[in-house]
Amino acid sequence: MAGTSHAVTNTPCQDSCLAQVNLTASGLPILSIFVADGAGSASNGGDGAEIAVEASAQLLADKIKSKEFTLNDELAVELVSHVREQLYALAEEQGLLARDFACTYLGVLATSFGTLVMQIGDGGIVIDVGAGLEVPIVPMSGEYANMTHFVTDEDAISVLITQCYPCKAEKVSVFSD
């Protein structure tokens, strides 16, 4: 849904999201939610957001086929790395810069045995893992006002913040700004 600033400036919504429940190789349901918000300053930010959520869902679908699948920080890094590879390859293919596909990136993966939360940039995640609602990761801002971090930034992996819980999420909300 386009926000009020999109309506005023007559620009399309550049956000993308995906929420689904799949089964792991052992038959365990896994909830996956991915949200990306294309940078307004990026010429193809909306496309970047769309690719980010699609690439994440694709890699996750492959990962959950393994009996050794686990929710951990390494999985978050692998997801972000895969998204970056896809965006950088598309930029090169189109003769553009990866920055042209800049977007924020948020994700939640939840099973009955654990929950993984990950974020680069602004937007927000609110979860309840049994102790009431909480914001597990403070939304990021950049060095100056109205700045944030993007999955295409050179330091994206180092600014990625993750939070792992050893229990299932009772309630989840993931949203862009």
Across the structure, where does each feature detected by a protein language model lie?
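PP2C/PPM-type serine/threonine phosphatase catalytic domain
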Residues: M1-S176
